């Protein structure tokens, strides 16, 4: 059991007879005095894969579920199934393409360090990605010299097909760091 204001992204809760995995949290502070802060949470129903949105007050009590997290790395594709290998005991974890469609936009061909599989009682529930990923821009309009002073952006295509907004001074071939949850440009990659 935890209060709504203690819930973090990646946690799992049981609510309305559903197992829900927290994907995103928006905190809405009210302008009126005495009103409590609202937490708008976006979930994925672990059993059905549906997206669910709920609002909670900061002091609402939610039933949290303990999940097991296992570090994995991408192994291979078998038809429409993606296989990830446990980094310690080499157990394979299989996901159908439609289960991890969003996550695949952030996994480059060479793989991504920091991925975890979430399991509960031996059942595979979800694939969790790290906060950021470094990728190379494969297509964008040419960079404009001297554009670093303006805050204007342009679309850039990445190797996985993901398109995000980047500053105008970047060009094709530049490596950038992307915040996965917010799908936004963070800066140049090291």
Swiss-Prot record:
Matches recorded under CDD domains: S1_EF-P_repeat_1, S1_EF-P_repeat_2
GO molecular function annotations of the record: translation elongation factor activity
A Pfam family matched in the record: EFP
Record-level GO BP terms: peptide biosynthetic process
Any one of the GO CC terms: cytoplasm
Domain of life: Bacteria
Family statement: Belongs to the elongation factor P family.
NCBIfam families on file: PRK00529.1 (NF001810), PRK04542.1 (NF003392), yeiP (TIGR02178)
Protein name in the entry: Elongation factor P-like protein
